[in-house]
Amino acid sequence: QTGKDATIVELTNDNDGLGQYNFAYRTSDGIARQEQGALKNAGSENEALEVQGSYTYKGVDGKDYTVTFVANENGYQPRVQS
């Protein structure tokens, strides 16, 4: 879809308001993203948000690339797959 605006063709979103959430979307140009997060050790001195997810996009070489990740008290930890 070169030169055209992408549109969202699929979307989900849920948040319990207590530290847990998830969302996902897919666009008409093939981009996709999903993520879920949860509060770990709530109320303690070790409380931390842990997020897991992935996103996919088409590179300039025409290949699809997917990045999966975890982000928590140990930082952002991505992995790229093509």
From Swiss-Prot:
Molecular functions (GO terms): structural constituent of chitin-based larval cuticle
Keyword tags: Cuticle, Pyrrolidone carboxylic acid
Example of a GO cellular component annotation carried by this entry: chitin-based extracellular matrix
Residue positions where Pyrrolidone carboxylic acid is found in the record: 1
Domain Chitin-binding type R&R, residue spans: 18-82
PROSITE patterns, A to Z: CHIT_BIND_RR_1 (PS00233), CHIT_BIND_RR_2 (PS51155)
Pfam families with a match to the protein in the record: Chitin_bind_4
InterPro entries the UniProt entry points to: CHIT_BIND_RR_consensus, Cuticle_Struct_Prot, Insect_cuticle
Protein role: Component of the soft endocuticle of migratory locust.
Protein name in UniProt: Endocuticle structural glycoprotein ABD-5
Natural source organism: Locusta migratoria (Migratory locust)
Lineage: Eukaryota, Metazoa, Ecdysozoa, Arthropoda, Hexapoda
